[in-house]
Structures are given as C-alpha cells and as structure tokens.
A protein has these predicted regions:
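Short glycine/proline- and charge-enriched loop/turn segments
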Residues: 25-31, 75-83
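Short beta-strand segments at enzyme active-site cores
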Residues: 55-62, 163
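Short acidic, Gly/Ser-rich segments with clustered Asp/Glu that frequently serve as metal-coordination loops
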Residues: 16-22
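A basic- and aromatic-enriched beta-loop-alpha substructure that forms the phosphate/nucleotide-
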Residues: 62-74
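N-terminal nucleotide-binding beta1-loop-alpha1 segment
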Residues: 9-15
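Active-site-adjacent betaalpha module
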Residues: 1-9, 45-53, 70, 78-214
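Active-site loop signature of alpha/beta-hydrolase-fold enzymes
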Residues: 18, 65, 169
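A short alpha/beta connector and helix-capping loop motif
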Residues: 6, 24-50, 55-57
C-alpha cells in the first residue's frame, strides 16, 4: 500500500478530556486514564512532523448536545449512563482536546455522536473534496472508536495507516486484537518512527503484514 504525503491527513480520534484527562468522565468513573497517556504523547510527536509536511490535521471529539437529542439509541438505551451523568457533552470540559495536542487555527475539528468518525459527519466528503485518500490514524479507544472508524474508512477505499503507539485502550487485549484486525483487513499498522520517516520522505510502500499474506 503506497503512502503519499501529498494526499495524506493526520486523523486523531477522541483524544479529549473525557477519555484521557484525569478529571474527565472516564477518570471520574474510576478508569485508569494513565494507560492512554502514551498514545497522546505519540500523537504529540507526530503532529509537528505532519504540520511541517503540510499534512492537514483532523481531530474528532465524542460530543453530544446538552439534551442528548443527537445521541439516538446510543445514549437512550445502549449507554444511558452517559446522559444520566452528563458525560461527553459538547458544552463541557469533557469535549476539550488534550492540551498536549491542542488544535491550531485551520485544523478541522469534527464532533461525532457515534463511535465511527465516518458515520453522520463531514469527514468523508471533506477528504474526497480535497483528494486526500491516505489517512494516518491515532486515537482512543483502539477497540471502539478507532476500530469503528478504521473499518469504515478501509471499506470506502481510503488507505489507512494506523500508528500503534498513537492508539490507546483501557484493555490491552482489545488493543492487540484491534491492531491485528487492522493489519489483516483494513489497512497497514505502521510503527511511529516508520510513519515519521515516510512523512519526511514524502512517500513509502508498506507491505502487508506477513502473518496475513495468504
């Protein structure tokens, strides 16, 4: 799969206070948000390299309206605790991007109300209108919103390059399983340093993982 910086974007999924911050809703519910810190740090290393190469940066946030009218079945029945606890509201600190990777003017910030960043958002039309078909991906959590997004992008013929260090999950088994699924069927899993080198070079060919070359 050929990577070309001239047709690439960096997509950072849900690296926001609600999931990654100690005072965010996940932290308040007792989750160990420190396990996601390495992924934010990796994203912080990718950002300046991509910016220097003029690669657009896109952030997504899981962010609901104050009344959760846009939450559908997700907040009504699947995860009603989100609404009950006022979690992940667009008008509250939960929606804020982590300061280590703060957006700059001109970056695209997409609010989403479903796990996939493709579903019911402007992401796909924005990419197609600009001829950007190579998507470098990092984000949280790997087994939920990252996986939902990678699957949707891969099946829409976008070239997806997942940086494992820039992805984080509360569950290590979910992390490994999802990365294997990405490598098997939906894109390429490219270590951070190799991805940085490709961005600086401007292009690279990434072979299929030999475990799945059958």
């Amino acid at each position: 799969m050929k990577f070309e910086a001239s047709s690439a974007v960096l997509l950072l999924i849900d690296m926001q206070q609600g999931f990654c911050g100690a005072q965010g809703s996940s932290g308040r519910r007792g989750r160990d948000v420190s396990v996601l810190k390495p992924s934010v740090e990796s994203a912080a290393r990718l950002l300046p390299v991509c910016r220097a190469a003029k690669i657009p940066v896109i952030y997504t946030r899981m962010a609901f309206a104050p009344d959760y009218a846009d939450g559908g079945l997700l907040t009504a029945e699947l995860r009603p605790g989100l609404k009950k606890n006022n979690d992940l509201r667009a008008d509250m600190p939960d929606a804020d991007i982590m300061p280590e990777i703060a957006p700059l003017p001109g970056d695209l910030i997409i609010n989403k109300q479903r796990y996939s960043a493709v579903l019911r958002t402007e992401l796909e039309p924005w990419l197609r209108a600009r001829g950007r078909d190579c998507v470098i991906v990092g984000g949280v959590t790997t087994g939920m919103c990252v996986e939902s997004t990678v699957r949707d992008l891969g099946q829409r013929d976008f070239k997806v390059f997942v940086v494992p260090e820039a992805c984080g999950d509360f569950n290590a088994d979910n992390q490994k399983r999802s990365l294997d699924v990405f490598a098997l069927a939906f894109g390429r899993v490219v270590p951070e340093q190799k991805m940085i080198a490709a961005v600086k070079t401007g292009a690279a060919d990434f072979a299929i993982d030999p475990r799945f070359d059958w």
